[in-house]
Amino acid sequence: MNKEQFDLNLVPTWRQGYRFQFEPAQNGFVILYPEGMIKLNESAGAIGQYIDGQQNVSAIIAQLKQKFGDISEIDQDVVDYMLVAKQQHWIDLV
C-alpha cells in the first residue's frame, strides 16, 4: 500500500500490554510485551518515538521530516511501519 492509499489521519496507539521504550542493554528501542521483546532497527525506533495516541500519521511524518530533513522516503517508510505494526498487533490505528 502506498501513501496515497493509506489514511494519514489515522492515529496510532500502542496496544494494551505493549510498551515502547529505549533499552540500554539492547542499545536501542524495543517493544516489550507479555511474551517477550522486539528489538527495533534505528528507523523503526525513530518512528515509534512519535506514537503517543495523540498525533495522526501525517503529524508523525511531519515531525520526522523536521528532524531528519525532507527525505522523500520518510512518507512511505512511516506508512510501511504502520502497516507492519498493525499486522503484528503492536498498534491500533483509530
Swiss-Prot record:
Pathway recorded for this protein: Cofactor biosynthesis; pyrroloquinoline quinone biosynthesis
An individual GO BP term: pyrroloquinoline quinone biosynthetic process
Molecular functions per Gene Ontology: quinone binding
Gene3D superfamilies, sorted: Coenzyme PQQ synthesis protein D (PqqD)
Pfam families reported for this sequence: PqqD
Record key words, sorted: PQQ biosynthesis
NCBIfam families linked to this entry: PQQ_PqqD, PRK02079.1
Family: Belongs to the PqqD family.
Quaternary state and interactors: Monomer. Interacts with PqqE.
UniProt protein name: PqqA binding protein
